[in-house]
Amino acid sequence: MQLLHLAILSPFLFAFIIPFLAKYAKRVHTGWFVLILPVLLFIYFLPMIRMTQSGETLRSVLEWIPSLGINFTVYIDGLGLLFALLITGIGSLVTLYSIFYLSKEKEQLGPFYVYLLMFMGAMLGVVLVDNVMVLYMFWELTSLSSFLLIGYWYKREKSRYGAAKSLLITVSGGLCMLGGFILLYLITDSFSIREMVHQVQLIAGHELFIPAMILILLGAFTKSAQFPFYIWLPDAMEAPTPVSAYLHSATMVKAGIYVIARFSPIFAFSAQWFWIVSLVGLFTMVWGSFHAVKQTDLKSILAFSTVSQLGMIISMLGVSAAALHYGHTEYYTVAAMAAIFHLINHATFKGSLFMAVGIIDHETGTRDIRKLGGLMAIMPITFTISLIGTFSMAGLPPFNGFLSKEMFFTSMLRVTHFDLFNVQTWGVLFPLFAWIGSVFTFIYSMKLLFKTFRGNYQPEQLEKQAHEAPVGMLVPPVILVALAVSLFFFPNILSYSLIEPAMNSIYPTLLDGHEKFHVHISQWHGVTTELLMTAGIVVIGTIGYLSLNKWKGIYKLFPSKLTLNRLYDKLLTMMEKGSYRVTKQYMTGFLRDYLLYIFAGFIILIGGAFAIKGGFSFKTEGMAKIGVYEIILTLVMISATVATVFARSRLTAIIALGVVGYTLALFFVIFRAPDLALTQLVIETISVALFLLCFYHLPKLRLKTKTRTFRMTNFIISLGVGVIVTLLGIASSSQRTKDSIASFFVKHSHDLGGGDNVVNVILVDFRGFDTMFEITVLTIAALGIYSMIKTKVKEEGKSGE
């Protein structure tokens, strides 16, 4: 295992230590120990920027299941490194923030930081592995760990509901994505993303291209909360604020964006990719920003804001597909450039806003915007953080959000000039949707800021006396807003170090024989259409915010009964009721019914498959002749079996069943296997004795009258099982595709096992572990039975078995 693999697995390894630290180092907040790891990982990944800047990549393979082509392959390029730095950098700040947010006296810190480290490791695995099967494994780990984090306050019903909702939706999408990965494997015969990229022409011309693309997009859309799968994200706000700041601003919700960007070289050649990704993203942007305006909970506003911003980034990745048709000029690649830049910007301003909202909740006891107001003088630093964050989110200068929003407008305006995918007619919708979504973004940004910090202070509405947060809680958001300001004045620090290498990863096929991408971001381009669109947003957005009370009645046009949340709840209820009804039909409580299902399934599936494929064919060559003794013993065994079934007392049935076992021992004698014969005799004797001992204490056997249908069903099922098992045995012995392994045991029994008794050597040496674990299972079963017999329950001074 190399250092790269260890870097990804280190959060999981460190998570094992956390419970002990939380238990035995109670004087120190557990977060201080946890903080060390993301900081070290960030420092480890940071120097790799020079490598990706020069166009180099880093690849390391750890074999896992090489026979299936599934290996733990770490591949670091510009895109993966960008996400790794976001995961570890934001993770460090969130961990520092959580130290002051979560009380070591009131909260269970051990589980919280175990879940947080699990999530961090899973996210690193998603963005840094090359094998899609390993990627899927880490993908599902992000869903599992986020479920645990969202449900951290598990005593709250809303927390449990939100956690279950996120798990159900994201895991369903993950299963779809797994199906897409398998389809790609069927096309390319490889699980490696790099090898898939090199077989783009093969994939594009295959009939499974569209199904694979749709399945992978479903996985990405569910994880990145795109319409109509966004409904899990607002309910996930029941998680502690550090979780929201980490998962829902910079990491988990960006996993879908990563997948779309990573698979763009494979799918972006198609018109379907362009339309699906860009339109779903644009519609989600408008839908999320529109619904954010009506929210009254600060975290709900940020949740719908996140939905909108993610849609904005995804729409740009969809539009960037045009570059694969026109070439890698700046005119067509600006959308990808803007998507990457806004990905970074969103992590800064949204992370700071989540932390600011957490501070407000922590220091006032509420997030209800109707109870807040007048906090600007009381919490001036938090106000400054919120001002920079909201203005950047609204796309106003001098903050980084303004630059990426202008680039977003540029990419949408250029769509109208694409002679591609028949966008001439519908191309005008792209900048129109972008502008409408930005207007609502401006309105909810102003609402979040001014409704919270301006107006009248209402101490009677608050659970706590409002005051400024401690310094430790303020440091992480201050760092983030400082980045938001700095990146406006010095954006090209990112251009050359992170954005260009990431674009090289998104467009690897465009660089063959061409020079590298050159990204340069400027604050001023003169009076352009984009600037006029921004001015219009400010004017219309200000009017919309000031007149919000007059037009917010429009939200009543959307009945609560028709919302996606209500639809989700109804579908869940219908599935639960339906599954209960179906289960009630076959879960009768009778063991014979369950055996009937099993045996009927065996007959239909196994018997049907063999019959269709012609598996029931027999060869008589090489078979020994059937002797008189064998015929006699067979008749005795059949007679004893019939007697067992029709016996009128348990004693008779047990004796007849014993005859079957002893007859089998005689077969072993005839076939010259004395050890097996002796073993069978001993086992049969013990079994008969135990049966007699147990049944002696049971009431007398009462023969109940059974219906003809019941008896006929039992007869058909038992006859079918017997016939199929017999046919399978004969067919398998007469249709050997390879030589029998018996000769190997006979030949090497003495040399390798040190014994001449082949059967004993097989049991003790060749399959020694099987024998050992069989004994272990029997021992555990015996202990369980013994404990049941010896355990006595005392009730009212009496004891009973």
From Swiss-Prot:
Residues spanning the membrane: 4-21, 28-50, 80-102, 109-128, 132-154, 166-188, 203-222, 229-251, 266-288, 301-323, 338-360, 372-394, 428-450, 471-493, 526-548, 594-616, 626-647, 654-671, 676-698, 710-732, 772-789
Gene Ontology cellular component annotations, sorted alphabetically: plasma membrane
InterPro entries with a match to the protein in the record: CPA3_Na-H_Antiporter_A, MrpA/MnhA1/PhaAB, MrpA_C/MbhD, MrpA_C/MbhE, ND/Mrp_TM, Proton_antipo_N
Record GO terms (molecular function): sodium:proton antiporter activity
Membrane topology designation: Multi-pass membrane protein
Coiled coil regions, renumbered to chain: none
A single BP term in Gene Ontology: sporulation resulting in formation of a cellular spore
Keyword Ribonucleoprotein applies: no
The UniProt record lists the keyword Cell division: no
One Pfam family it belongs to: MbhD
Keywords: Antiport, Cell membrane, Hydrogen ion transport, Ion transport, Membrane, Sodium, Sodium transport, Sporulation, Transmembrane, Transmembrane helix, Transport
Function: Mrp complex is a Na(+)/H(+) antiporter that is considered to be the major Na(+) excretion system in B.subtilis. Has a major role in Na(+) resistance and a minor role in Na(+)- and K(+)-dependent pH homeostasis as compared to TetB. MrpA may be the actual Na(+)/H(+) antiporter, although the six other Mrp proteins are all required for Na(+)/H(+) antiport activity and Na(+) resistance. MrpA is required for initiation of sporulation when external Na(+) concentration increases. Also transports Li(+) but not K(+), Ca(2+) or Mg(2+).
PANTHER family according to UniProt: NA(+)/H(+) ANTIPORTER SUBUNIT, NA(+)_H(+) ANTIPORTER SUBUNIT A
Subunit structure: Forms a heterooligomeric complex that consists of seven subunits: MrpA, MrpB, MrpC, MrpD, MrpE, MrpF and MrpG.
Additional information: Mrp-dependent antiport apparently occurs by a secondary, proton motive force-dependent mechanism, but the similarity of several Mrp proteins to membrane-embedded subunits of energy-coupled NADH dehydrogenase complexes raises the possibility that there is a capacity for electron transport that could provide a primary energy coupling option for Mrp functions.
NCBIfam families per record: 2a6301s01 (TIGR00940), PRK12645.1 (NF009285)
Protein name: Na(+)/H(+) antiporter subunit A
Organism whose genome encodes this protein: Bacillus subtilis (strain 168)
Gene name of the encoded protein: mrpA
